[in-house]
Amino acid sequence: MIGMGIETSCDETSIGIIRDGKELLSLGIFSQIDLHKPYGGIVPEIASRAHLEKINLLLEETMEEAKIRFEDLSYVAVTSSPGLTGSLMVGAQMARCINMVYETPILPVCHLQSHFAVLHLEGVPTEFPVLGLLLSGGNSAVYILQEFGRMELVGDTMDDALGEAFDKVAGLLDLPYPGGPHIEAKANEYIPTPDEKPILPLLLRNLPQGEVSFSFSGLKTAVMVLLEKQKEVSKEQICWNFQNSAFDLVERNLKRAVAKTGIRKVFAAGGVLANTTLQKRLEVWAGKNSVELFTPKKKIYCTDNGAMVASLGYHLFRKGYKKGVDFTVNPSRQEIFS
């Protein structure tokens, strides 16, 4: 069974083609980082226009690389929520066109759920239920994954997502956009002394027992105040402390989620998982707490991509899920498609 996945929810235009849910035949990604860099963040109008300009060429390239015809496709999965409305509409229209010409079944899928499906592409055992940790530019949450395409929220962010916090703090430090790689690089240059005290606060220290919640806006404010009061603090020290404080909250929330649900298997996904320091910390944490942890081995799978959309589509298609061309896109989060 050959399937296509179309991803245009935010600032990556991507099309992936896979066989039987996990064999990658081709994957094309156009990143818009350079387009948004001058603005220090994503501009929705620029994003949707770039998708429109690139998607046809990307389709041709991925089809040619996969060496298939449109008639070979069993389904076309497309991200329909959540995301930027204009961007989502570009991918949706491409899926509709393929359906109208070749009668290929359409599967609108949830972007959040597809991030976890990428682990199936890497051969991760998929025995459910498992905990899903999603850390990206727009999401910081923990879920119970009942199966591919069905999940329950355990804990969410109360304000900024972790990826967003990286970008905002990078802006305060005059580091390039996107902030994640540059903050990690600066942090790696700093070596704290054994008795050194943190210069940034412990996040959500008074969170009620058993509650799983993220909050990163206060960390950005703390960095701003620190820069105003202590000019002599280096960027490297701030970046190291920023990561240390943020990742500490991630670990504490995972520990709470495991205790709350009794589930000791964790799938971690999303763009922030490209951070090597975070991956290593989570691996150490999992080992100490007897938790099975799985993260994407390829950094390209941490970012938004069409392969993960196609993989989720495979599982949903086998269950008989599909929609007509009149499906709608939704910028808000939809956890379950029925």
From Swiss-Prot:
Pfam families: TsaD
GO BP: tRNA threonylcarbamoyladenosine modification
Binding site for substrate: L134, L135, S136, G137, G138, D167, G180, N275
Family matches, as InterPro entries: ATPase_NBD (IPR043129), Gcp-like_dom (IPR000905), KAE1/TsaD (IPR017861), TsaD (IPR022450)
EC number of this enzyme: 2.3.1.234
Family: Belongs to the KAE1 / TsaD family.
Entry GO MF terms: iron ion binding; N(6)-L-threonylcarbamoyladenine synthase activity
Reaction catalysis annotation: L-threonylcarbamoyladenylate + adenosine(37) in tRNA = N(6)-L-threonylcarbamoyladenosine(37) in tRNA + AMP + H(+)
Cofactor(s) the record lists: Fe(2+)
Keywords: Acyltransferase, Cytoplasm, Iron, Metal-binding, Transferase, tRNA processing
Binding site for Fe cation: H111, H115, D304
This protein's GO CC annotations: cytoplasm
HAMAP family according to UniProt: TsaD
Functional summary from the UniProt entry: Required for the formation of a threonylcarbamoyl group on adenosine at position 37 (t(6)A37) in tRNAs that read codons beginning with adenine. Is involved in the transfer of the threonylcarbamoyl moiety of threonylcarbamoyl-AMP (TC-AMP) to the N6 group of A37, together with TsaE and TsaB. TsaD likely plays a direct catalytic role in this reaction.
Name of the featured protein: tRNA N6-adenosine threonylcarbamoyltransferase
Cofactor, how bound (note): Binds 1 Fe(2+) ion per subunit.
Gene behind this protein: tsaD
Cell compartments where the protein resides: Cytoplasm
